[in-house]
Each structure stands twice: as C-alpha cells, then as structure tokens.
C-alpha cells in the first residue's frame, strides 16, 4: 500500500469590501474600453479635463521650471515666460527693501508683458500675438461698449479646434455654464421687467422707527441685474472713492456711475473664466482688482480702460480681495491668502494659510491689522506685515459658531470689528479685538449676508436673508433696531457705501439692486 501525502492550501475567503472594489474596477475598465472603441485617442474633449491630461501638463510645467500660475494647469491666455518678470516670484521671498512711496506722487504699477501666448493641445508651436493685433482685441482683455459685446463665433471656433481652457478648477468647474451679465435701470412705469409690471417697484421703501411714528421713503434708483450669483461666499460689489460702482455679473464686471446713475463700461472675461468671483477698488485712484473662478487676479484701470497686469498664485476660486495702499490681499477657497505688492515685478510678498475656504478679507482703516474670515468659523487677526516674516503667526484667533463672511471694521474705533452670523447663529457680533469678547450681540433671527458701518448716522446696516430679506439698521452703541430698507425678495448678498457716506447700494439674490439715501 502506497501512502501519498497531499498538501492542502488554505482557501482564501474574500471579504465584501474586496469584492466591491473588484466590481468597481471592473466597471471602470469596461468604461475605458468603450471610450477607446468609440473615438480616436487624438480627439480632444472641449469641456472636461481628464486626469491624465492634467498630470502630463503639470509634470511638463515642473520640468520646464515654469511656475504653475493661478490654476493646476496654465491659463488659456498666459504671459510669455520669457517676457514675464513676475513668473519667478516665490512665496518665501520677503517684502521689497525700498520704502513705500506716497500715493500722492502717483502709483507706479509694473505693466504686463507685451507678448501674449495662446496655448492649446495642438502639436503646432504656440501662437504668439502682439497687443496691437486684431486677434488680441477680440480676446478676453477688452472693454465692451454694449452688454452683449463679444465675438461668440471666435469662441465656437476655438472649441471646435480643440483649444480648451486648461485653467478650470477640476473639482467644481465641470459642467459649469457661463451666464451673460446685464444691468438695466428700472424706468418705473415703462419698465417691462417681471415684477415691475405688477407694481413690485412700489414695495421698495425705507422705514425709520421713532416711537410709534414710521417715516418711509422710496429708493433713489432701482436696477435690474442679470447674472448676479447667489453665492454667500463671494464678494462682487464695491463703490470707489471716485464714485464708480463695480458689480460682477456672470463673466463680466459692470462699472456704473454713482453720480448720474448711468452705466459706463463692462469688462468681459468670458474667455478666461466661468464667472467673476470678487471685485474691489483701490482706496486711492481708479485701479480695480478682479478675482475669477479660475484663481486669477487681474488689475484694471477704469479710466484708461486697460488691463494693468495679472497676479498669479491661486489654484481655486478667489472669493475675497482687500487693498492696503499698494498691497493687495487675495483669499481663495483652498484657504490661501496671498499678499501682492503691485509696484514690483515679483509681486507676491507674503502668504497666510487657513484650513478652510477664505470667505472675507478686510484691512483696518489705519492699515495696521488684517481680519480674515473662514468657512470653519474662525475669525483671525493678522499684523501689518503678515506672512512676510519668519513665522507669520496671527495676533488673535476668535472662534465663531458659523462661517465668517459678513465682516467690517468700525471707521471711528480702530479696534472694533462687526461680524454677522450665519443661518444657525443669526446674531450681529460687535467685537473688541483686544479681548476677543462681544461688546453687543443683538439677534436678527436670520442669516446676515453682508454688513457695513454708516459713519454719518453712527449705525450698522446688515443685509439679511430669509424670512424678511431686508436691510436692517442698528444704532450704535446700543445696537437697537432703528429702521430698515425693504423690498428685496431674496437675501441681500452685498452692501456698499458711497464715498460721501450718504447713500447705500444693496444687491440681492433676486436680481434687484437699489440705491438708498441713508442720511
């Protein structure tokens, strides 16, 4: 009898998780095979950016020692590396050694390069265009005399040739749709807008509370806005010292004359971004900073109607901007705050880091402190030269119960800051930043989307959300409700004050804007 020794292997038992991942990988593999069979690999999608394309372009950029500016992949209109002095800027570099010059002697801003390069996936060499050529005049860097101005045929041809925009944030921009912005003055009885035909214009009024007596008055002007994004985390309205109002509508920035209530110009950025995410005027002069959904910050001169330069460095939506003389601070949804000195070629002089998206940035009136509000509910106070030092540590961090978006420094008390609470909070917080404690905290019973101080009347105006969707007025220092502006049918996203501090511009998510006489 022969004995045979049989070796038995232990049977491997697959878990449910392993089987699930096998099924997922099998489905992905089948999908990739179908895509290969349906079309040639040389064909380019005009909208979606695949991970392989993103990775290959990113590696090529790093190998060529060209800094990735404004997005994971280069922008469609990119300054030529050979002519762009700011492309070699580094975050670790300190501030410029020269002494800041007085603004009275004139602001000197380093202009953009003279050569623009149109990048594409074609195998041909990049096409270089001069500023004076007709093709550049049809590009995104233009002022439009009409709201609908724009060469749409050029954009369609660009898409059919496979020249796609590679600077889109890959996490959110897929499937995004561009909206053409419009700005129309309400002409009362002749207005054909929906709502005005049914007498909705008569519902707009200002009410002042004085005991049992209520005084009411109508707004100076009512404006219809098309393309205003209903986004709590954007800052798309600002009123300049030269009485010019800038409001971002879709892919354009409209400039409106606050004196004679007339529309002047609009900046069309439809080719290089999906929407404009933030605007702010320089305190002195006509320089306008524009943040885009692609992480770009552009500087424009409203008088000469020319673009001054691009400030690269962000990888996501730039939702907050704030000037401190010649230093521009920009905050993104990835939690980065960059400080740009617009007078020098290597503009980036400091960087701050947050864990969540930056919702708001405000420099104090004296320029000594910077406050930043984030989506994680942290209100952070930074020194005058944040990020440029060795450590770049904040002076104080004040936790809040909701995201910190509505925020403004007191004009007559430099160490007092007003912060509006979100939906879960609904309170107006007036803080002493030295102690970090609340001075007054009245409840508004709604989301505070925007706020601004009124120095003439010593009040605070807050843009409210549901259920009233009004602009509430609070008397300082008691913070009692003293009145309000009524008529908006959706939350009041943005507020801005005129340079003479007598009029208030309110813009709501229902597409209406009003100019109110506040004193």
UniProtKB/Swiss-Prot annotation:
Keywords for this protein: Cytoplasm, Repeat, WD repeat
Expression tissues: Expressed in multiciliated cells (MCCs).
Annotated S-S bridges: none
A GO term for molecular function: ubiquitin-protein transferase activator activity
InterPro entries assigned: Cdc20/Fizzy, WD40/YVTN_repeat-like_dom_sf, WD40_CDC20-Fz, WD40_repeat_dom_sf, WD40_rpt
Gene3D superfamilies: YVTN repeat-like/Quinoprotein amine dehydrogenase
Cellular component GO terms held in the UniProt record: cytoplasm; deuterosome
Biased composition (Low complexity): 87-96
WD repeat residue intervals: 229-266, 271-310, 353-392, 399-441, 443-484, 487-519
A GO biological-process term: de novo centriole assembly
UniProt region (Disordered), positions on chain: 77-106
Main location, first listed in the record: cytoplasm
Compartment(s) where it occurs, according to its Swiss-Prot or TrEMBL record: Cytoplasm
Family: Belongs to the WD repeat CDC20/Fizzy family.
Function per UniProt: Protein regulator of centriole-deuterosome disengagement and subsequently participates in the ciliogenesis in multiciliated cells (MCCs).
Protein name as annotated: Cell division cycle protein 20 homolog B
Organism: Mus musculus
